[in-house]
Amino acid sequence: MSAKQIVFSTDARDRLLRGVELLNNAVKVTLGPKGRNVVIDKSYGAPRITKDGVSVAKEIELEDKFENMGAQMVRAVASKTNDLAGDGTTTATVLAASIFREGAKLVSVGMNPMDLKRGIDLGVAAVLAEIKARATKVISSSEIAQVGTIAANGDAGVGEMIARAMEKVGNEGVITVEEARTADTELDVVEGMQFDRGYLSPYFVTNAEKMRVELEDPYILIHEKKLGSLQAMLPILEAAVQSGKPLLIISEDVEGEVLATLVVNRLRGGLKIAAVKTPGFGDRRKAMLEDIAVLTAGQMISEDLGIKLENVTLDMLGRARRVLIEKDTTTIIDGSGDKASIQARVSQIKAQIEETASDYDKEKLQERLAKLAGGVAVIRVGGATELEVKEKKDRIDDALNATRAAVEEGIVPGGGVALLRAKSALVGLTDDNADVTAGISIVRRALEAPIRQIADNAGVEGSIVVGKLVDGRDHNQGFDAQTETYVDMIKAGIVDPAKVVRTALRDAGSIASLLITAEAMIADIPERGSPQSTGNGAVDSMGY
């Protein structure tokens, strides 16, 4: 085991604080509508340009091990906030740095760090409750568009596109963001269920121009196992021919002889048919087949259920208004399943999501839920260069996450105003222990940090903005950094999702209060000749 270096007390907190400040300085420049971009070097390809706080935080690794501990703790705040709320990472970083900075000062003059932590926890809890109480529900499409616009740094086109997508697929529907092959950003809404399996043979294609299979009002055979026996299939194939309707086969696989026969029948024009493989793997494959069965009012043909293929009749098959099959995707549009059955299936999946502890299982269940609940919308991001597309994609991802959070918990005035106004929850909140009361004051001061930073990034003195807003009585009044005017934030459409604001403060308070209580730090002794062994590396030149 290698020898360790140990630092204590004020030295430990100072080193932690230097690391926190370095990370904070790199991240905070991106905050607000006039926030700047950060250029990140990549080991391959061109550098990346981003205004996404968590992307910046994830790139930061410091040479000094003790400073790096501080930076990594705050980086964890940004990552956790991003995971839970999908946005607000820069706000969380600024809040955490402010709380730790003020706390470290008070500990250095003799206050008890554990009592300060208690005070911070009390203050944060009071503010979280206040923000939740002040949140207003998002109902209209225009409100959803406002949230998306703010999160996309004032890009109204992005906000409106997200609102349109949510209108089409519902609040629980899947909205994905991918890179387009053109310079335009566009929304493509897939009504119905889409899964990532395409046609088994290009000979099934009915639209040669678009290279896809288009089946109108087809029957859908949902089979759990491989189809290897042509004899067993004959009764259902004959019934399909007599009905005059197309037939879609969804099964684990179709063996060579059977597939060849289906293709020959398709080419001769006797049978409009197509076959695709079942989506998913393992147990999920069976669950997805059951989802398709519910959506199309069909039965899953499984020998486990005592249903043999040769005994299958047309009334056991699913139905849909239209099916589109491309090389890699199958889309079932307007299945015949009744709403009550689909809703019962949705409720069942929601219950499974609540029960599962695995993040992977949860993600897969949510995908199934979204497919059943409302279909899929795809936002294809275009741009003149690859760098522009990636930067825009970051912003749209943020906007999409923020919009989902707004629908979930409602909205509050944006631009740091909600946190500033929530200071009212701390009025009269004190404790018999002076150090606990000082901890509450740390939170009171930190609530001003985001709005100060937004103003600073716009080239305006933050303390003047805060002073003017504190003097005003209108709870919705705030500073519009884009126009550098004081406006009613709700009416101006400058809003934040309550969930994003609450998550940012909760995570920042949690990590920062723990950093304050650090009394010793342990790390490997740096090798001789490394920058750490001669001092603090590049940090000294930055004036800390």
Curated annotation (Swiss-Prot):
Forms a cylinder of 14 subunits composed of two heptameric rings stacked back-to-back. Interacts with the co-chaperonin GroES. This is Chaperonin GroEL 3. Keywords: ATP-binding, Chaperone, Cytoplasm, Isomerase, Nucleotide-binding, Plasmid, Stress response. One of its GO terms (molecular function) is isomerase activity. Its main location: cytoplasm. It comes from Rhizobium meliloti (strain 1021) (Ensifer meliloti). The gene is groEL3. One of its GO terms (biological process) is protein refolding. It is an enzyme of class 5 (isomerase). The lineage of its organism: Bacteria, Pseudomonadati, Pseudomonadota, Alphaproteobacteria, Hyphomicrobiales. HAMAP family: CH60.
